[in-house]
Design a protein with these regions (language model features):
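Hydrophobic alpha-helical transmembrane segments
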Residues: 1-70, 110-111, 209-239
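Short amphipathic alpha-helical coupling elements at transmembrane boundaries
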Residues: 3, 7-11, 78-82, 193
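Helix-capping/transition residues at the boundaries of transmembrane alpha-helices
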Residues: 11, 69, 80-82, 145, ...
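Secretory targeting signals
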Residues: 29-36, 45-51, 55, 97-162, ...
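Helix-loop-helix units of permease transmembrane domains in multi-pass membrane transporters
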Residues: 67-97
């Protein structure tokens, strides 16, 4: 798994995707940070992360689009299926490589609450909790993108498909409110407003609550989509 992780991580910076992904997130964060905190005087950095939710929807598909679709296009996916390393370890190695790339801008984001603190009142506990929640939300989107990438050999289809799915997830609270009552008056839809991907994030950024149940929900989704990815790749072994 370590060799897969190193190879995959290196590929993101050899192809410039890693640099573009990091630069885009850091630049957009800087714009929102300047607007909300430096010029607007808001003491909570979490406001910036709330505004960054849509930005991450656009960035994640760029990161995940090649992770498995490129292997399928170049026919090197057969090497994955015959590798002495188990398939779950290969998938996990690739996932952790993307997580590492994503963690770099997150580490830079951690400087922002400290800058606020140096210039006045800051709420470090709430802000760092929000950064962690933002990282976990992005990790869910990465797992989803990885699964979509396993379904196609086209990077463009992978990116567009991932963006479409995470966009629906982002808009789901509004979509569900417009559904007919006979579709929404049940146990599942009563549960969903409390545990939606963006709803959990809002608990941290808007209400400053450390939502443990929401984090468990995130972790469950990550494992679920990693499992789907393993099954998707495994299916090709027998096809």
């Amino acid at each position: 798994m370590k060799a897969v992780y190193k190879r995959e991580l290196k590929s993101y910076f050899d192809s410039m995707i890693g640099y573009i992904f990091i630069a885009f997130l850091v630049a957009m964060n800087g714009i929102y940070f300047l607007y909300y905190n430096m010029l607007g005087g808001y003491p909570y950095y979490s406001y910036v992360l709330g505004a960054m939710e849509f930005i991450i929807l656009m960035a994640i598909p760029v990161l995940t689009m090649k992770c498995l679709s490129d292997e399928r296009r170049s026919k090197t996916d057969q090497l994955l299926l015959t590798s002495p390393v188990s398939l779950p370890k290969i998938i996990l190695g690739k996932y952790l490589a993307m997580e590492t790339v994503f963690a770099i801008p997150m580490a830079i984001f951690c400087l922002c609450p400290l800058i606020i603190k140096a210039n006045g009142t800051a709420y470090l506990r709430e802000d760092f909790a929000s950064i962690f929640a933002f990282f976990m939300m992005g990790s869910v989107f990465i797992a989803i993108g990885m699964f979509i990438s396993s379904l196609t050999e086209s990077q463009i289809i992978s990116a567009v498909g991932t963006f479409g799915i995470v966009l629906v997830i982002y808009l789901w609270p509004g979509i569900s409110s417009m559904l007919p009552s006979f579709l929404t008056d049940n146990f599942i839809t009563d549960l969903l407003p409390n545990y939606t991907v963006t709803g959990v994030m809002d608990s941290f950024t808007s209400y400053h609550l450390f939502d443990i149940g929401g984090l468990v929900f995130y972790i469950s989704l990550i494992f679920l989509f990693l499992f789907f990815t393993i099954q998707s790749v495994q299916k090709r072994r027998w096809s």
